[in-house]
Design a protein with these regions (language model features):
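N-terminal secretory signal peptides that target proteins for export/translocation
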Residues: 1-9
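Intrinsically disordered/low-complexity terminal segments and short unstructured peptides
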Residues: 5, 18-21, 104
């Protein structure tokens, strides 16, 4: 089987809880933070405040609640299907795309409860510098969609930075750094934004590191990821947008490259209810 076929037929196993509670029905989904415009400059990490004002909810309680909600949403994530659009651009000196690579997949359920990514649109490319196939983007598979569950958060130092308004959301900001890096396991290092109503993570900004450094390859130069989540149902917030800007060194100089991933059309793929996040 070709590498391309292997990618298209990659099977994902999802674990389902034997007994789960029901999410409360939501009259209206809450708008999440808006992704940046296509021509926006790369984001800058917010500097830590020397002594931020204490939040109205104790910091340990905020951390406990958002990590427990992350766990509940991770379980719920296995009962959804979605489309994924991956686009890579080479940017010219005027900030315009000079070449693109794009493909679209859909997570499709199987009768046995598993699912696979089915190719909806054949990869199209007009890139001049990068030589990409879908398999070139395999480092993306190492980035978990909902990584800050309690069992993983114990490996991090989580420090409260302050508050920030993200469009219509009021958020708490935390710096997250691994206590220790490992050779085989990647850890997040960066900043997360937590909604002050649902106590869920709505935005992350940072990179994934191992003992050997940041996750990247020659054909995947992207290291720093700006990720946004959207309110899918009730208090469920799933990733909807990821962006990374970097550069590639060529004989003609540095070439600006950009990665954008969009997750669209989240739909429940089973009638089994999902566990509700903590109130």
């Amino acid at each position: 089987m070709s590498m391309r076929s292997t990618f298209v037929l990659r099977v994902f196993a999802f674990a389902f809880a034997a007994s789960v509670a029901t999410y409360p029905a939501a009259a209206q989904l809450r708008p999440g933070p808006l992704p940046p415009p296509a021509n926006a400059p790369p984001p800058v990490v917010i500097p830590a405040e020397p002594k931020p004002e204490p939040p109205p909810v104790p910091v340990p309680e905020i951390i406990k609640r958002f990590s427990e909600n992350e766990q509940a949403m991770l379980v719920a994530h296995g009962s959804y299907v979605y489309k994924k659009v991956v686009r890579v651009e080479e940017i010219d000196d005027n900030g315009k795309p000079a070449g693109t690579f794009q493909f679209t997949t859909e997570l499709t359920p199987l009768p046995d409860g598993r699912a696979y990514e089915r190719e909806l649109k054949h990869p199209e490319t007009s890139l001049n510098v990068l030589n990409l196939e879908p398999e070139s983007l395999s480092p993306l598979l190492k980035i978990p969609p909902l990584p800050f569950i309690p069992s993983q958060l114990v490996h991090y130092d989580v420090n409260y930075v302050g508050t920030q308004k993200l469009d219509e959301l009021n958020t708490y900001i935390f710096r997250v750094e691994p206590k220790q890096v490992e050779r085989q396991h990647a850890y997040f290092k960066g900043v997360i934004w937590v909604d002050d109503q649902d106590f869920v993570i709505v935005k992350t900004l940072g990179h994934w590191v191992t003992e050997l450094g940041e996750i990247s390859t020659d054909n995947f130069p992207f290291k720093f990821f700006d990720t946004y989540r959207e309110n899918v149902q009730g208090k469920i917030w799933f990733p909807s947008y990821l962006r990374s800007d970097d550069s590639v060194n060529t004989k003609h100089g540095l070439v600006h490259v950009r990665l954008v991933v969009r997750w669209e059309d989240y739909k429940a793929r089973t009638a089994a209810p999902a566990p509700a996040p903590q109130q």
